[in-house]
């Protein structure tokens, strides 16, 4: 049996852009994404602290420092400056659960790393 468990999280990131006319996804500063163990194309859940919206999308690695940009139709669910939590989950069996520690990255309002 497997369980969906928290794999990693970027906590309280700030939306820097929302691009309605892009195909879809969330663009995340590559360094920040790698620290959170997020891979390009990985499914993530976005929770907007300001308005309560929750939605799923996939990761695109961005080149700009501190970039967190929601793309496509989901851009209507956020506003620039909103605070979000970016969550990734993984299916794990009992042994994997016991050995796993989620990667949690805390950032400030400029999406600079506070703590890992």
Swiss-Prot record:
PTM statement from Swiss-Prot or TrEMBL: Is synthesized initially as an inactive proenzyme, which is activated by self-cleavage at a specific serine bond to produce a beta-subunit with a hydroxyl group at its C-terminus and an alpha-subunit with a pyruvoyl group at its N-terminus.
Cofactors: pyruvate
EC top class named in words: lyase
Entry annotated with the keyword Lyase: yes
GO biological process entries: alanine biosynthetic process; pantothenate biosynthetic process
Catalytic activity as recorded in UniProt: L-aspartate + H(+) = beta-alanine + CO2
Signal peptide: none
InterPro entries found in the cross-reference section: Asp_de-COase-like_dom_sf (IPR009010), Asp_decarbox (IPR003190)
CC cofactor note: Binds 1 pyruvoyl group covalently per subunit.
Record-annotated active site: 25, 58
Gene Ontology CC, one term: cytosol
Single Gene Ontology MF annotation: aspartate 1-decarboxylase activity
UniProt keyword annotation of Cytoplasm present: yes
Keyword list, A-Z: Autocatalytic cleavage, Cytoplasm, Decarboxylase, Lyase, Pantothenate biosynthesis, Pyruvate, Schiff base, Zymogen
Function as written in the Swiss-Prot or TrEMBL entry: Catalyzes the pyruvoyl-dependent decarboxylation of aspartate to produce beta-alanine.
Family matches, as HAMAP family: PanD
Quaternary structure, from the entry: Heterooctamer of four alpha and four beta subunits.
Name assigned to this protein: Aspartate 1-decarboxylase
Originating species: Helicobacter pylori (strain P12)
């Amino acid at each position: 049996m497997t369980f969906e468990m928290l794999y990693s999280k970027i906590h309280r990131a700030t939306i820097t852009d929302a691009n309605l006319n892009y195909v879809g996804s969330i663009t995340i500063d590559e360094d920040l994404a790698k620290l959170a163990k997020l891979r390009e194309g990985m499914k993530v859940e976005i929770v907007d602290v300001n308005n309560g919206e929750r939605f799923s999308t996939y990761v695109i690695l961005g080149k700009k420092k501190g970039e967190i940009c929601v793309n496509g139709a989901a851009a209507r669910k956020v506003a620039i400056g909103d605070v979000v939590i970016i969550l990734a989950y993984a299916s794990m069996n009992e042994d994997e659960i016991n050995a796993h520690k989620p990667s949690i990255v805390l950032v400030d309002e400029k999406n600079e790393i506070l703590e890992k």
